[in-house]
Amino acid sequence: MYYMLIGFIIVVIAVIGAGYILKRKHYQRINELEEKKIKLRERPVIDELSKVKKLKLTGQTEALFESWRSSWDEIETRLFPDLEEVLLEAEMNTDRYKFRSATHAENDIEQMLVVIEKQMDQILGGLKELLISEEKNAKESRATKEKFAELRREVLTRGFKLGETLPYIETKLSELSESLNSYDSLTDQGDHLEAREIVIVVQKEMQVIEAQMERIPSLLHETDTILPEEMTKLRAGYEEMVRKGYYLAQMELDKEISRMKNQIDKMKKNVINLDLDEAEQGVEELHNEIDLFYDTLEHEAEARHFVKENHSPTSDKLQRQNAVSDALAEQITEVKQTYHVAEDDLAVYLKTSAKLSEAKENFEQLTALIASGEIAYSAAQDTLKEIDAALITISAEQDKFAEELRSLRKDELEARDDAERMRRAIITLDRKMERERLPGLPEEYLSLREHMGESINALEKRLEEKPLNMKAVSQDWRIAEEDLTHLTEKAEEMMENVRLVEHVIQYANRYRLRNKELADELVQAENHFYNDYQYKKALEIAVTALEKVETGAFKKVEKAYESKVSVDDIE
């Protein structure tokens, strides 16, 4: 019982202690919120409202002021009283240990303070801006009016430079003057915000007018003086070149100058209407067009120099190429008596001849047009360049064809010499075979030998034809050379096989008496060697038989043969 009482007392003390701590914590937060409320109460909203109220307010400014005052009335009559009630509720809940309810109330107070502070910031900010606006308007209106007066003076002193745009500028200034009067009226009435907007608009408009007044004189100078003078100079240069014999009808200058005058009139209207960007673009484009016409005239002058420098040389080139073409025609006639000239080759000559005739005709027409002054020198220059390029191509093609004709005789002589050389090569090969003292020649080789003779006969027969077809000769010549190469390779292979067979059999004889199988196979190899002259087959049989008895023996025999070592010396 005693211990239970002690435990109960401890629990009571703990609860009371915890309640005290929580209560103290809530009072601390409530005090902080109360201090924040007091600070908000101390903000000088009423003072600022009083300052602005002393100003004479109308229109937009008055409406704004009334909205700010209404907002403050709401804070005074509703928001602050509501705040006081919730503060009292938080204190009561804390006293009664209703900490959860107290926490909710404290949170509501914080939100209410945020709303009040934000609303007061808006009121004070607006009032401050209004007061500053009134002061700033006064300063800027003085500066704006001074700038306006300066613009007025400049129009009076420099108005003659503005030409037909002067009435438009004066109208703009009159409109600005009315705006400034409206500003004064609104200021007197107390509508400072709307007056502020007018000042800003007037300042921007004056900047635009000032920039226009800077640009207009130079644009008018361009349209009234510079561009017309440029066109006059262009026409004078054009007419001077026509008097000197230039053909310039392709430029259609009268039509183009009329068009450019219309462009100038359009640019003047743009300037008068103060569409200055478009006017400046038009001026730049027209200068570029005039420059292009000058470039054309300059090109014609350069082309005239080119034509005078190159007309006679081109005429000389034509005459020389005509002479070359005529000589080539005679050469073709002579060659055709001896050689067959293919139609394709003749077509090449005929094509170049037609090109040459066309170039000659173009040159004659050009010469006539230059003499009559009916062609622009630039066009004449282009035609001369085309003719010169055509002559270069024609010359190269005809030189190539002439070289091919000259090579016919050279190729014929080489073919005849080579046919004789191939006959001598066969005789030499036959003698070499005889020195080898072969048992005989196989049918395959004899057939190749016979075919080789027929190939040379065909070549020699072709060389006796009239007219001589060198393409056919070249074909027979190539076949004969291929046959000779093949025959020579076969002969060398056959003689090589004969020597190797003899060496292999001679080496194998050391086993012949002791090995019947080897002896029988060697007899078979010798039959092929001496009877049907199949030397390659004889070698294969002898090598196979020897390798059965002594592996690697053939390599030793082959090495000894290549080194010219006697078979008897092979170990």
Swiss-Prot record:
UniProt KW keywords: Cell cycle, Cell division, Cell membrane, Coiled coil, Membrane, Septation, Transmembrane, Transmembrane helix
Chief location category: membrane
UniProt record similarity statement: Belongs to the EzrA family.
Protein name: Septation ring formation regulator EzrA
Role: Negative regulator of FtsZ ring formation; modulates the frequency and position of FtsZ ring formation. Inhibits FtsZ ring formation at polar sites. Interacts either with FtsZ or with one of its binding partners to promote depolymerization.
Name of the gene this protein is made from: ezrA
Keyword Ubl conjugation: no
Positions on the Cytoplasmic side per record topology: 23-571
Membrane topology of the entry: Single-pass membrane protein
Extracellular side: 1-3
Keyword Cell membrane among record annotations: yes
GO CC terms of this entry: plasma membrane; septin ring
Spans through the membrane: 4-22
Listed InterPro entries: EzrA
Lineage: superkingdom: Bacteria
Residues spanning the signal sequence: none
One GO term (biological process): septin ring assembly
